[in-house]
Amino acid sequence: MSRTIFCTFLKKEAEGQDFQLYPGEIGKRIYNEISKEAWSQWVTKQTMLINEKKLSMMNVEDRKLLEQEMVNFLFEGQDVHIEGYTPPSQ
């Protein structure tokens, strides 16, 4: 059974996460405020960041950078800037 939340990223009612995807207070906030659709958008940006910046999830500094980018993207409305990437025209 899916749960419905008000997604603060999409600014509308949407299907919520099935379980907490991220640890700690940020994880609780994601679970309560970020929909599956918004999380999917973040995962796409995260993958691009990891690949383009050659981040290693074994490196603590890289994980901190990724976490900050995630908070900026999901909660502060800042898009992820990836050097050299031009989004396809709509």
From Swiss-Prot:
Pfam families according to UniProt: Iron_traffic (PF04362)
Cellular component, GO, one term: cytosol
GO molecular function: iron ion binding
Superkingdom of origin organism: Bacteria
This protein's record includes keyword Heme: no
Statement: the UniProt record of this protein carries the keyword Iron: yes
One annotated GO biological process: cellular response to oxidative stress
Keywords, alphabetical: Iron
Assembly and oligomerization: Monomer.
Function per UniProt: Could be a mediator in iron transactions between iron acquisition and iron-requiring processes, such as synthesis and/or repair of Fe-S clusters in biosynthetic enzymes.
Similarity section: Belongs to the Fe(2+)-trafficking protein family.
HAMAP family reported in the protein's UniProt record: Fe_traffic_YggX
Protein name stated in the entry: Probable Fe(2+)-trafficking protein
